[in-house]
Amino acid sequence: MRLLAFSIIGITSLLLIACKPNTRSDVKVSEIIKAGEQAPYADPGQKNFGGFQRRDTTGKAQAPRPKFQMPEVKTVHFNDLIMSDPFIYPHGETQTYYLTCSGGWMYKSSDLEMWTGPYAIIDIKGLWLERAGFAAAAEIHKIGDKYYYAGTWSDHSELIEQVPRRYNVPHNQTYLLRADNPEGPYTSFAIEPGYDYQPHDWDCIDGTLYEENGKIYMIFVHEWTQIIDGTMDYIELAPDLSYTVSEKPITMFRATEAPWVTEMNASGEATFGLKMPGWVTDGPQMFRTQTGKLGMLWSSWGKERYAQGIAYSESGTIAGPWVQEEEAFMANNSGHGMLFKTFEGKLIFVVHHASENGPRKPQYWNVDDSGDKLVLGTQINI
């Protein structure tokens, strides 16, 4: 286990990040960040994201997540699925829809109504990924004649940074696996086993793949839990996706650039049972409208807790600049959505939603991409 000590310069930098001006005049951190202190515990009954796992300042990594036990494979109705971060890959050759999510496994369906699963489709034996309890925000992409599985793993046995008055950051990375068909098995192919595609000392999650002008990029989240004002960043990958060719990630935007995003403490939201101030970035997904406008679906916290937002690129390329919509695309504690087309050519938005006291469940929504901006329609009830 490697402990990176905070220098006086590092602590000062963190304080400056918390207090530095940004594009919104209404933005401020609701609690002063003092070096070396643990974030206050959540109040009894307070809204809380991510459970109540306590963080400390002892220099130890968090307790590891419990490993998920694979449930029995069975066929269930879409409305009975319970999951976060749904991602659907339509496979035209077999007329099969493949659904992945946080947890890392796969379901499959021929009609988007009845889903069979979950199936274990990855082989990570011998990699540090085994020490993670599960893969978060799993996705499947086809590039060339191969299928790629992007998932986020969190190795809680390695501490990469002890952030003052926040929490101890574990080794968080989005890693890529590869297979010859969408059902796997997906195995490591990186230039070296356990290769870090993102900087090792960054808290990174939710990586997704995007192709533009013959180049392949990974777009990912640099977590607000580490840097207070979360960012979206990207790196360029090698043509075979086995390593990163970028010297360093490029930041696309910060959470505070979106007018609809609220600061976690100000909105009354605790995280991991602690009152950590900051602004969230989550779940990037790229899309183009029929007019060629490049957009990114992404999530954060707004007036109604978790929310789905959109940013658009003024240049039509990944380089941006990225302009945020004034209002959330979808609120009501819903987010981490993505777009896919049915085999009949219909565009559908799939997203997870949680009622006040209920679990996260996926939903289908109609959307219209015929103009320069994506327009949300009605929920699809099946």
Language-model features, listed with the residues they occupy:
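Positively charged n-region of N-terminal signal peptides that target proteins for export
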Residues: 1-5
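Sec-dependent N-terminal signal peptides
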Residues: 6-11
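C-terminal motif of bacterial Sec signal peptides marking the signal peptidase cleavage site
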Residues: 15-18
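Carbohydrate-active catalytic/glycan-binding domains of CAZyme proteins
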Residues: 21-382
